[in-house]
Amino acid sequence: MINLTPTELERYSRQMMLPNFGEAAQKRLKSATVLVTGVGGLGGTAALYLAVAGVGRLILVRGGDLRLDDMNRQVLMTDDWVGKPRVFKAKETLQAINPDIQIETIHDYVTSDNVDSLVQSADMALDCAHNFTERDLLNSACVRWRKPMVEAAMDGMEAYLTTIIPGVTPCLSCIFPEKPEWDRRGFSVLGAVSGTLACLTALEAIKLITGFSQPLLSQLLTIDLNRMEFAKRRLYRDRSCPVCGNDAPWRYAQSNSMETSSNCTHS
């Protein structure tokens, strides 16, 4: 059984004071592996709060190099790192903040070639990728391998958030069967907005891992930060969904040897 060191007991003592948290929840965090895709203003900040909360292992996935116009929101980066792979700087910063956790970096985007191995390596995923191609790949793999996924996205002053449990809640394709047009350089972003959503995303993951509070299951949280309005909308599974529906291909391809274990809890 996993134990907490004296250093960890002191480091996390304030959060262990929360109702329904305690050492049991902290041990679940230490035992967990979380995959974070799109380690930018959203994913990088979410990874920061998972790291300081004591998630035992993070897998950070992001291709490409840091750009100067990333610096208004990517809090793990420094100005001297512009032009270099951001995922390595993310690890360096997080490891300096919390040396007790393990961090693995993948300098690549989510692709059809790597998505299954990435998802199988983790207990759950945070979908913070910057395009729907990667998001759809991750969604399909999480459904296939029965791994929970926190889905978070933003544009300008608006954002949305939900938690997906394969076989229990709608998947991303149920929620967004039609994909919006997207321009990687054409969307506006303010660091305080991506940071707000990132904190909520990390909190969803912590709730899911520990079970200390109820996550957003079958609910879509929509956020309008212009008006400071938060609303929740009920979501329903699409039984004919090509990804998670009753006739989805993975249902016929799965075998008894498929690894679907997860340290996450949900109710």
From Swiss-Prot:
GO cellular component term of the entry, any: cytoplasm
InterPro entries (alphabetical): ThiF/MoeB/HesA, ThiF_NAD_FAD-bd, Ubiquitin-activating_enz
Any one of the GO BP annotations: nitrogen fixation
Any one Gene Ontology molecular-function term assigned to this protein's record: ubiquitin-like modifier activating enzyme activity
UniProt keyword list: Heterocyst, Nitrogen fixation
Keyword Transcription carried by entry: no
Recorded family membership: Belongs to the HesA/MoeB/ThiF family.
Protein name, as recorded: Protein HesA, heterocyst
Biological classification of the source: Bacteria, Bacillati, Cyanobacteriota, Cyanophyceae, Nostocales
Gene this chain is encoded by: hesA1
